[in-house]
Amino acid sequence: MNLKLRAKRVEKGLTQEEIAKELNISVATYNRYEKGHTEMTETTINKLLTLLECKYEDIFLY
């Protein structure tokens, strides 16, 4: 599970539905990203980082 991704989303006050809409993906797909069941494309990662106003290291490096 990507706890950092979920934590950052919650910190920004966004729902999975809002993130999915902004990324133009289904809520189920976004949920799989947060659970670590599906890998994101580079384009999706970049959109997500912009949306969450953070750096790659903030979410994906441990």
Feature locations, PLM:
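Short basic helix-loop element that most often maps to the first helix and adjoining turn
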Residues: 3-22
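Key DNA-contact positions within bacterial/archaeal DNA-binding proteins
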Residues: 17, 27-31, 57
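Recognition helix of helix-turn-helix/homeodomain-like DNA-binding domains
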Residues: 25-39
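DNA major-groove recognition helix of helix-turn-helix/homeodomain DNA-binding modules
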Residues: 43-58
